[in-house]
């Protein structure tokens, strides 16, 4: 899902004259879609997949990696995927969209494993996937997301439905993970009901 959002952002950035280095991550090879749109959104795409053998790039400057996003970024930076066409140190902005654990890993790695390869004062944001309910902008507080200032330790709160794009260094990812777990039981029950009802629905309405 994150890739579907990012390719529209990438296209807008390229149109504005920016260079875009795009790490597209997937769990399974069958999960990839909108390939042409993603290629149009980036000067360089690194196709990442947990499942071997990974993707075969269509363009000469694109790369492929089997593993997670953080390891892919590191391998790209040190040249294990070939000479970097766009150096990480030239990046002024980093945008992460995906699971809370993936965004947390990227947020942390920027100050550890990836720090030698990043511009010191780059700005990183994540599209925070807090649980949401009313979608009426700051009404029900289901999407309330804690922020922790890394300098002062002060905690503040934002409504993610009002602004999903939040600075990675402020987001309390442990708090986000706990909030997402609140709906775990309902999500599992819903999945069971879908699996139970799907055969009957398919019999009534054959797939075309």
Task: Tell what function each PLM region has.
Residues 30-208:
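Reductase modules of NAD(P)H-dependent flavoproteins
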Residues 2-14:
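Histidine-anchored nucleotide/phosphate-binding helix
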Residues 26-28:
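Active-site glycine- and acidic-residue-rich loops that bind
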Residues 1-2, 99:
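Alpha-helical hinge/cap motifs
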Residues 13-20, 40-43:
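Conserved S-adenosyl-L-methionine
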